């Protein structure tokens, strides 16, 4: 039997190796230097600290003002708001682009889309695009695999499907470092996929597919229950891998139109359909965190929650809320690039609010840093590790941030100042509302989705804003009196461009023969039962819209 002093030493050693900073323990060690020496000798042979699991949760089309924790006045609070209260909520969180495909490529790689090549005449990968995220790009999944992590993904991909045939799956997630790929949307949820009869009589089977890993399992797909499929797959992955470090990427179809929710959440939010969708996503996130707690790994798991870009404001009440920020999806105004950004790590990250600049591209560098691996040095990373920002409250590693639209540099932020070289036309929400009926969108459109052309204005000298005093970008500053700021902007852009090697444009190579089709003899429809219908609470709104509908 071990003696009591020996057991005491073992317990004390455990406290030291866990990096405990208890004052009583520190006083004991100061008063007993021989004990400290013994502990340190034993400590040389201790096991390394456990690598934290990393969970990345990405919402689609969610604006910076959609969550209660970010100030929405009518949205009910949910579990994501609890994470914001108990974790670190950032007010200056940014994404690498204001549109789905390029933004997601930046999340996966830590690099601006202009470096990767995820731009072109079109803005996103389409089902008939032959290209996808280049295999030469290291993804966060591949980086974490190199660090010894199991890797899993569920939900929306939107980084390419096929290359040479309708079934080769050349660009799907399993080819980019994910060991496990559950139910996933290789393209996206869209207006065309509506199966309720709200926007479409019948969903477009040429755009709407549900896969499991590389297998097409439903075309089109049922919206009802989709979030539950993603969530169940995520829970299964956690259960199967909880004993070892893992990286899990959950890319929700919420909050992209067409909106949908299961019966448990329909007609439950005072905010309407958008609120119902958000409550369903809150529930999914809570189930994921509950599973971590059930397996006693919540305190060894860091969770990032972000959106892929700002809201689609032309969709009115179904498009999301950019809060005080101007613009939305596809825009280089703050409303397009600034997002909710929450990091949650119980017991490690102190609760609080941070005004430091952080980006979606920082996640890969931070995860690699925490996982004990390094990223390649043969390329430029726009993302930086924010480990010290999270754990120590340090200043952001970013002194600047670049806003691109395709391969056009639209604006740059330097400190608190933002200089626009080009701006897209943005109308007031009231004007967008004229294209809606009772808040219900009548058409699938963008007022200005361009990076140059008639709805884009060039500025020379640049249009300058102080984002600390004027985050809504309403009051441009005079050049006179800000000469030093303009010089800093100029030198920052020159340095950036001097090191920039643009990627080859990837979004304009098309071949309609590669579009997924599970059953050509049946109009590419399989495992789908069309049951149009909508909850009663939506019917008055839809009836109002029908009276105003313009084909």
Curated annotation (Swiss-Prot):
What post-translational events are described? The conversion to 3-oxoalanine (also known as C-formylglycine, FGly), of a serine or cysteine residue in prokaryotes and of a cysteine residue in eukaryotes, is critical for catalytic activity.
GO cellular component entries: cytoplasm; extracellular region
Provide the residue positions that the database annotates as binding Ca(2+).
60-61, 100, 308-309
The top EC class, named as a word, is hydrolase
Cofactor dependency: Ca(2+)
Return one GO MF term: metal ion binding
| Reactions catalysed, as given in the entry | an aryl sulfate + H2O = a phenol + sulfate + H(+)
Q: Where's the active site on this chain?
A: 100 (nucleophile), 158
PROSITE patterns referenced in this protein's UniProt entry, alphabetically: SULFATASE_1, SULFATASE_2
Blocked amino end (Gln): residues carrying this PTM:
21
Q: Which UniProt keywords apply?
A: Calcium, Cytoplasm, Extracellular matrix, Glycoprotein, Hydrolase, Metal-binding, Secreted, Signal
Q: How and how many cofactors are bound, per the record note?
A: Binds 1 Ca(2+) ion per subunit.
Enumerate the subcellular locations listed in this protein's record, separating them with semicolons. Cytoplasm; Secreted, Extracellular space, Extracellular matrix
Sugar-bearing residue positions? 164, 213, 296
What start and end residues bound the annotated signal peptide?
1-20
* EC nos: 3.1.6.1
- List modified residues, type 3-oxoalanine (Cys): 100
Q: What does this protein do?
A: May be a structural component of the extracellular matrices involved in cell movement during morphogenesis.
Q: Which family does it belong to?
A: Belongs to the sulfatase family.
* PANTHER family, per the entry: ARYLSULFATASE, ARYLSULFATASE FAMILY MEMBER
For this entry, the protein name equals Arylsulfatase
Organism, by scientific name, is: Hemicentrotus pulcherrimus (Sea urchin)
């Amino acid at each position: 039997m071990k003696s009591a002093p020996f057991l005491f030493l073992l317990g004390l050693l455990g406290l030291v190796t866990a990096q405990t900073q208890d004052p009583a323990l520190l006083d004991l060690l100061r008063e007993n230097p021989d004990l400290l020496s013994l502990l340190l000798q034993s400590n040389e042979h201790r096991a390394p600290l456990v690598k934290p699991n990393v969970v990345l949760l990405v919402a689609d089309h969610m604006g910076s003002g959609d969550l209660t924790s970010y100030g929405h006045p009518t949205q009910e609070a949910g579990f994501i708001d609890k994470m914001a209260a108990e974790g670190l909520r950032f007010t200056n969180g940014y994404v690498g682009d204001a549109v789905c495909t390029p933004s997601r490529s930046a999340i996966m790689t830590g690099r601006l889309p202009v470096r990767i090549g995820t731009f072109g005449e079109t803005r996103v990968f389409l089902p008939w695009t032959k290209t996808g995220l280049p295999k030469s790009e290291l993804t966060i999944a591949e980086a974490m695999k190199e660090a010894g992590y199991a890797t899993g993904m569920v939900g929306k991909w939107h980084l390419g499907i096929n290359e040479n045939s309708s079934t080769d799956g050349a660009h799907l997630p399993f080819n980019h470092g994910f060991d496990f790929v559950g139910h996933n949307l290789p393209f996206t949820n869209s207006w065309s996929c509506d199966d309720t009869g709200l926007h479409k009589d019948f969903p477009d089977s040429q755009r709407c597919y549900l896969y499991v890993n590389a297998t097409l399992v439903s075309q089109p797909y049922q919206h009802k229950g989709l979030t539950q499929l993603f969530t169940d797959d995520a829970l299964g992955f956690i259960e199967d891998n909880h004993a070892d470090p893992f990286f899990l990427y959950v890319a929700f179809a919420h909050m992209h139109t067409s909106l949908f929710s299961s019966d448990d959440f329909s007609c439950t939010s005072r905010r309407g359909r958008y609120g119902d969708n958000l409550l369903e996503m809150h529930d999914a996130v809570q189930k994921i965190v509950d599973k971590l707690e059930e397996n006693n790994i919540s305190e060894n798991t860091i969770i990032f929650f972000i959106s892929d870009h700002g809201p689609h404001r032309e969709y009115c009440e179904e498009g999301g809320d950019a809060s005080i920020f101007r613009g939305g999806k596809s825009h280089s105004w703050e409303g397009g690039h600034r997002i909710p950004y929450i990091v949650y790590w119980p017991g490690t990250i102190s609760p609080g609010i941070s005004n430091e600049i952080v980006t979606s591209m920082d996640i890969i560098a931070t995860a690699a840093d925490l996982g004990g691996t390094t990223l390649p040095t043969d390329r430029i990373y726009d993302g930086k590790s924010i480990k010290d920002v999270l754990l120590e409250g340090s200043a952001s590693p970013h002194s600047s941030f670049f806003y691109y639209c395709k391969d056009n540099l639209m604006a740059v932020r330097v400190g608190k100042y933002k200089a626009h070289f080009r701006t897209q036309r943005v109308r007031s929400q009231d004007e967008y509302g004229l294209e809606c009926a009772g808040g219900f969108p009548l058409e699938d459109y963008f007022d200005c989705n361009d990076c140059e052309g008639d709805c884009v204005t060039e500025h020379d000298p640049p249009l300058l804003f102080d984002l600390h005093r004027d985050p809504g970008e309403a009051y441009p500053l005079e050049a006179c009196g800000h000469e030093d700021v303009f010089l800093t902007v100029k030198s920052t852009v020159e340095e950036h461009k001097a090191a920039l090697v643009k990627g080859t444009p990837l979004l304009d190579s098309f071949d309609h023969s590669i579009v997924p089709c599970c059953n050509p003899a049946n109009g590419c429809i399989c495992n789908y039962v069309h049951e149009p219908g909508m909850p009663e609470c939506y019917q008055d709104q839809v009836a109002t819209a029908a009276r105003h509908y313009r084909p």
